[in-house]
Structures are given as C-alpha cells and as structure tokens.
C-alpha cells in the first residue's frame, strides 16, 4: 500500500491527474501493487503563493520549472532492482501521460513497517492481519 504525494510546478488539474495516473500505473507495473490500491495527494504550485525550490543542476540533472516531486511511502521489502524499475517507469509514464520530461521527475521512497499504517477506525489493519 503506497501513499503518494505529488507536487508539481505549473500544474493544473489535468496535468496533476495525468501525473497521478502515471505514478499509480508505474507502481502497478514495476512492483505489483493492486490496481485498486490508490492513495494520493496531488498539489499544484503556481510559484507565487505555493512554491517549490530546487537546484537546477544538482548531480548533473538539468531541471526546469516543469519539475515534479514524487514522494512514495510504502512498506519495506522491495529490492534495489524493483525500485530502479519503478523510477524508470514513473519517468516514462510521466512523459507519456503528462508531457513531463524524465529529467524533471524527482522521486523519493520512504519505507516503513505494517504497524505504521492505519486505514481508518484507529486500527493498524496490516499489523492486526499479520501482513
């Protein structure tokens, strides 16, 4: 069960939706999450009231104002190869669905344990189910 936050500059509702679909489809393709397991927060930033700051050339990647930050929180257990495949697939689909160049797709993954999730009712469902 990943929880995804997407922050994008100059992103209207259509672009945010396309980016959300790209990330979700990549999660399904690359690491096998169920298609109905979608929990996302999508935020567009206009550069005036809501801003994103970034280094335009950090590590030799040349970013511009089409930058998208994707933060994925998920349970631990994926291999380095699965994560690399996920990064590649997100970049591919962000370009295909939203026209965002791969150089502008910045992804982070944070992992946690089953006890760290409550899907409602004040219960840690994964922990109680032994998942």
Over which residues does each language-model region extend?
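Interaction-mediating elements
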Residues: 1-131
